[in-house]
Swiss-Prot record:
Its cofactor is [4Fe-4S] cluster. [4Fe-4S] cluster 1 binds at C377, C380, C383, C426. It is found in: Cell inner membrane. It comes from the Bacteria. Residues 368-397, 407-436 form the 4Fe-4S ferredoxin-type domain. This is Ion-translocating oxidoreductase complex subunit C. Gene3D superfamilies: 3.30.70.20, NADH-ubiquinone oxidoreductase 51kDa subunit. The complex is composed of six subunits: RsxA, RsxB, RsxC, RsxD, RsxE and RsxG. The lineage of its organism: Bacteria, Pseudomonadati, Pseudomonadota, Gammaproteobacteria, Enterobacterales. Belongs to the 4Fe4S bacterial-type ferredoxin family. RnfC subfamily. Its EC number is 7.-.-.-. The keyword Transcription regulation does not apply. [4Fe-4S] cluster 2 binds at C387, C416, C419, C422.
Amino acid sequence: MLKLFSAFRKDKIWDFDGGIHPPEMKTQSNGTPLRQVPLAPRFVIPLKQHIGAEGELCVSVGDRVLRGQALTRGRGRMLPVHAPTSGTVIAIAPHSTAHPSALAELSVIIDADGEDRWIEREGWSDYRAHSREALIERIHQYGVAGLGGAGFPTGVKLQGGGDKITTLIINAAECEPYITADDRLMQDCAAQIVEGIRILAHILQPREVLIGIEDNKPQAISMLRAVLADAHDISLRVIPTKYPSGGAKQLTQILTGKQVPHGGRSSDIGVLMQNVGTAYAVKRAVVDGEPITERVVTLTGEAVSRPGNVWARLGTPVRHLLNDAGFCPSADQMVIMGGPLMGFTLPWLDVPVVKITNCLLAPSVAEMGAPQEEKSCIRCSACADACPADLLPQQLYWFSKGQQHDKATAHHIADCIECGACAWVCPSNIPLVQYFRQEKAEINAIRLEEKRAAEAKARFEARQARLEREKAARLARHKSAAVQPAAKDQDAIAAALARVKEKQAQATQPVVIQAGSQPDNSAVIAAREARKAQARAKQAAHPMADSAIPGNDPSKAAVEAAIARAKARKQEQQAGSEPVEAVDPRKAAVEAAIARAKARKQEQQTGSEPAEPIDPRKAAVEAAIVRAKARKQEQQTGSEPAEPIDPRKAAVEAAIARAKARKQEQQTGSEPAEPADPRKAAVAAAIARVQAKKAAQQQVVNED
């Protein structure tokens, strides 16, 4: 029948699947004009009354404010809120707001002074002289949001539309039972609404502007037609009454025949929709220079004696409005904010009116009926037939109860408009909308947690990348600041490397151990002492010019001293005296060193010509001969045997003697002798010891 009816109409309309026809109950409140409500003594203004983040506070406790003064700053999607009247800010604290759970949100609490003084208002009567961006910014800064129930910032919505909007739809359907706020506003302020529509059309520049209104509002239709009598830029479309024809997607399909895709928006098909109350607020913001500080609210239900529509200041407590309407609560009285299908019950009556509050319903017990017990689903599919969004509420119900979030998402639970049509027709009295709301809240919480985790991961990776960049920069700075070694340093490095290679080559040579021989480290010790002596020789800065006297050869002096000591001991033994203490080779070496030192001192004092350089190998041989003679002499005396001579210590003493001899050579100013090979020195020392033994034996034979 609807299709047959629309075929004869000049302006074609379409239909959507599903929908219901509940009792309208609109005549209780749409018969009386709009009226003002006395100011409440205290106002509670939540900072967040829209979709998006709350704005930044710009007032403090104790500040005096005027009506229309901004309480927060609007940046991006943050919509500012304004003072509903003049007064004093007494607190900025969390307060229960319009929410099913009465959640507390940060609010500005103002004590009214009763004067209701405005800020200085500056209207743009010639709005066409201003740019599109300036108009959008003014609408945003004056706090205009969608007053049809969504609360989306109007300025952001207009900015996002851009140049792709071809159809502007003004939603005047107001399909939910009991609510008549838009109906009464169109009856009393039709001209201002049309002017606001023209401002929106000037900003968007669409090809067509359509007003969709249900046929159950004859007075409002008459007023709009009277205002649009000579207008050709706006078309008024009257549609059949059907719930929920006021839904954005449903009204778009009715007026244009286009369906919004799943998960998409109406702007994806070139359509932008605004509510008639939003159009009126746009006119007051642009032309009159008045921020949104009040809105029309329907007060209805059998529990109020004076139902109707009132201008309610934002932040007015619900209790104050109901008392003005003659509220007579019963024992178990409920108050619903919104309509009976999409609204929610208020936990208490001190919550404030906000921008999305369009109705306060106070029904009697008989009016709402007794609560029904929830029963099991009988799979009758009545909910699927009534769903206007072409969903499967029965399946979504099972997925919601089973916490199957992935399947619920796959069945487009996000497209549910929560109209309540499925719950209305359910024979088992299952509150399907409550299950769907809870499921969508859980899915949103999961997505929010995943988003936070992704952001935290991105921050961590960015930090790691920054640390790597800083590390690379530090290394680059260190490399650029490194000083290249000088030529002499390079020579020293090359010499050190050569010494290391020589040591490694020496270490790789095989060590031959003869059978029956004892370990002898004299060669290694002699080599070490030779290297130390060579290093000390290189470090000498000023070699002495004086030379030694040939007659004062320290090695010869040491030999003579040792021979003298041996003869003295032999003379004592022959004289029949007590045996003398055995000769300690270490003491002998010390005495020889003292004698050599005295000899060197004598050489320096004489200042004679430099003597022939002392050969350390010869000195070692002579010292070995002296030690051999001394040992032979001790054996012949028949005294107690002395402490055996340690070959290692003897080698050390020989090395010390050679090192001192080389130092003496350098100090005398003579040409440096060829550096001694430690292996050759050790061999020479061994040969010297053998020769000393043979000489001692020969001397004994001669004496006998």
